[in-house]
Regions:
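Terminal amphipathic alpha-helical/low-complexity segments used for targeting or macromolecular assembly
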Residues: 1-51, 56, 186, 192, ...
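ABC ATPase A-loop
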Residues: 47, 59, 77, 95, ...
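Glycine-rich beta-solenoid repeat tracts in large extracellular/virion proteins
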Residues: 52-53, 71-72, 89-90, 107-109, ...
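Conserved mixed alpha/beta catalytic, RNA-binding, or beta-rich assembly cores of soluble enzyme
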Residues: 85-86, 91-92, 97-99, 103-105, ...
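Fold-independent oxyanion-binding glycine-rich loops
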Residues: 50-51, 62, 69, 86, ...
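Glycine-rich active-site/cofactor-binding loop and its immediate structural neighborhood
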Residues: 56, 60-93, 99
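Glycine-rich hexapeptide-repeat left-handed beta-helix
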Residues: 110-220
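Short loop/turn microsegments at loop-to-beta-strand junctions
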Residues: 55-56, 61, 74, 108, ...
Length: 220
């Protein structure tokens, strides 16, 4: 699936231009360090509450709020008007777009979240790219190799390509999405699903269907 097929919604012009350079998801992952190439020091334009831990080169945009018990480790970028909740941890190599909500006790590791992404409490995201308006439910795990290794599904030498969610994709509560998974725009992975592979746009995947998919109209 092409990058242009996954991400087409409104986003910051500079980010839109940057994304259009890449034909494949693999190329996008390889180039992600370019986002932080010019980030050398802390640039705090938003509100960082007392008690928050900000380490290294971190940019926090205007109108953003970082809860007093959150942790952000640079290099990392947080866009404008974004909220980082209590006990959330943003680890080095992460890009959080504007108007995002990162809930209580979430972990974001070396991932790129575009604008208006909602990550609910307790979710874990590693080496992943989340499109505009996507939603990750409470307790969901994206690209968590530790879980997959415990099930014997990946090796220690697996690549650092995690999960890609297209614009407006949804991952339900307590679902686990395996590394290398691509979820098309407007596709829904229901609660408690163990998902892997490539899912075309406008699909619905539920636990009851045992990972079978069915077409879903764009208006439903």
């Amino acid at each position: 699936m092409k990058v242009s097929d996954l991400f087409s919604a409104e986003m910051e012009p500079d980010l839109n231009d940057w994304l259009r350079k890449f034909a494949s998801v693999g190329d996008l992952f390889s180039a992600m360090p370019q986002l932080y190439a010019n980030l050398r020091a802390q640039n705090i334009q938003g509100i960082v509450e007392d008690g928050a831990v900000i380490v290294g080169a971190v940019h926090i945009g205007m109108g953003s709020v970082v809860h007093g018990r959150a942790i952000i480790r640079g290099p990392a970028i947080v866009g404008n008007n974004t909220f980082i909740g209590s006990h959330a941890e943003i680890r080095a190599g992460s890009f959080i777009g504007s108007k995002c909500v990162i809930g209580h006790s979430c972990s974001i590791v070396e991932s790129m979240l575009m604008s208006s992404v909602n990550v609910c409490s307790g979710a874990f995201i590693r080496n992943s790219v989340l499109g505009f308006g996507s939603v990750v439910g409470p307790g969901a795990a994206l690209g968590a190799e530790e879980v997959e290794r415990s099930l014997g599904l990946v090796s220690e030498t697996s690549s650092k390509i995690g999960v890609v969610l297209g614009d407006y994709a949804v991952v339900g509560a307590n679902s686990s999405v395996k590394p290398g998974t691509i979820v098309g725009s407007c596709t829904i992975l229901g609660e408690g699903v163990l998902a892997g592979g490539t899912y075309e746009p406008n699909q619905t995947v539920t636990l009851r269907q045992a990972l079978e998919t069915k077409p879903r109209s764009s208006g439903s």
